[in-house]
Amino acid sequence: RQGLFDHPYQIDLKETDKEVNCAENQLVALQASKESLVLLKNQDAVLPLDVNKISKIAVCGPNADEEAYALTHYGPLAVEVTTVLEGIRNKVKPGTDVLFTKGCDLVDANWPESELIRYPLTAEEQSEIDKAVENAKKSDVTVVVLGGSNRTCGENKSRSSLDLPGRQLDLL
């Protein structure tokens, strides 16, 4: 019970965040996340990754080292988030090389117009993608973290395309 209607203009948002983000709710959220994942294809049984067989792992993508993509305006914002890059660094065995390159920004300089009109890659964009590809070639496995953000998804964020925004398809 949050008492929203007892004193509707005197809410302590920090206390509300603590209540919503309690240990019990964290466990429920974790279980819901586990149960909502669907693996469509596991070619050559690559998953789950075996940390003992990986000496070098490439991580790329605009959301790989980004916390904000995991948060929404529909829940508590004062929560601790582990980025995919941090999670990988925490899980691999000591001595494993983790090569990170962003690869591209979430959206390109011409976005949102670039959803309708294809612009050529700039030299800087191509260079960043090339770095990510080189890291992938040198690695045992590559994790690519793509998607949207509150800038590209949400209320009042209508888009003309369901494709990944920016240069993410070029990176992939």
Question: What is the predicted function of each stretch?
Answer:
Residues 5, 13-172:
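C-terminal non-catalytic regions of proteins with extracellular/luminal or membrane-system context
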